[in-house]
Amino acid sequence: MISITEWQKIGVGITGFGIFFILFGTLLYFDSVLLAFGNLLFLTGLSLIIGLRKTFWFFFQRHKLKGTSFLLGGVVIVLLRWPLLGMFLETYGFFSLFKGFFPVAFGFLGNVCNIPFLGALFRRLQGTSSMV
């Protein structure tokens, strides 16, 4: 079994709060304070979960620099109180950074989900490009 440290548990909680504040800020018509707070919590929680060195390594790989620049640029734009533009940049950066993870996640959801329609939908979204 995988052992999880106390710092990783705290990181999961902080990341969850970050996602909550980002979604809540989006629901409140792109409230810049909530979005900025959510961004900071999300990035802090991510670094607590996987560690500072691995976080730096993930974001600054040569083939991920474009996505990283859009994501971090979006965070800066949100902090400068331009939330709509910042969230568009962040969304593009997020999909650019995590595009290799989506087929794996959809494949997992397709296997776990017992509802026939949703299982077939997730398996179709998985496609043929798998990281395994």
Curated annotation (Swiss-Prot):
Signal peptide start and end residues: none
Compartments in which it is found: Golgi apparatus membrane
A Gene Ontology biological process term: retrograde transport, endosome to Golgi
Cytoplasmic face of the membrane: 1-9, 53-68, 122-132
Principal localisation: Golgi
Transmembrane stretches, start-end: 10-30, 32-52, 69-89, 101-121
Pfam families: Got1
Record keywords, A-Z: Golgi apparatus, Membrane, Protein transport, Transmembrane, Transmembrane helix, Transport
Gene Ontology cellular component annotations, sorted alphabetically: cytosol; endoplasmic reticulum; Golgi cis cisterna; Golgi membrane; membrane; nuclear envelope; trans-Golgi network
Lumenal side: 31, 90-100
Membrane topology classification: Multi-pass membrane protein
Protein's job: May be involved in fusion of ER-derived transport vesicles with the Golgi complex.
Family the UniProt entry places it in: Belongs to the GOT1 family.
Protein's name in the database: Vesicle transport protein GOT1A
